[in-house]
């Protein structure tokens, strides 16, 4: 899953939902 400016938060099966600092 690649984070984008429109969708920063990621829903991962193992790690759960999180927002990478590399967003934007």
Swiss-Prot record:
Database matches in InterPro entries: Fibrinogen_a/b/g_coil_dom
Subcellular localization(s) per the UniProt record: Secreted
Gene Ontology MF terms: signaling receptor binding
Main location: secreted
Gene Ontology CC, one term: fibrinogen complex
GO terms under biological process: platelet activation; protein polymerization
Keywords: Blood coagulation, Coiled coil, Disulfide bond, Hemostasis, Secreted
Pfam family, one: Fib_alpha
Modification after translation (UniProt): Conversion of fibrinogen to fibrin is triggered by thrombin, which cleaves fibrinopeptides A and B from alpha and beta chains, and thus exposes the N-terminal polymerization sites responsible for the formation of the soft clot. The soft clot is converted into the hard clot by factor XIIIA which catalyzes the epsilon-(gamma-glutamyl)lysine cross-linking between gamma chains (stronger) and between alpha chains (weaker) of different monomers.
Assembly behavior: Heterohexamer; disulfide linked. Contains 2 sets of 3 non-identical chains (alpha, beta and gamma). The 2 heterotrimers are in head to head conformation with the N-termini in a small central domain.
Described purpose of this protein according to its UniProt entry: Together with fibrinogen alpha (FGA) and fibrinogen beta (FGB), polymerizes to form an insoluble fibrin matrix. Has a major function in hemostasis as one of the primary components of blood clots. In addition, functions during the early stages of wound repair to stabilize the lesion and guide cell migration during re-epithelialization. Was originally thought to be essential for platelet aggregation, based on in vitro studies using anticoagulated blood. However, subsequent studies have shown that it is not absolutely required for thrombus formation in vivo.
Domain notes: A long coiled coil structure formed by 3 polypeptide chains connects the central nodule to the C-terminal domains (distal nodules). The long C-terminal ends of the alpha chains fold back, contributing a fourth strand to the coiled coil structure.
Protein name: Fibrinogen gamma chain
Species in which this protein is naturally found: Canis lupus familiaris
Gene from which this protein is expressed: FGG
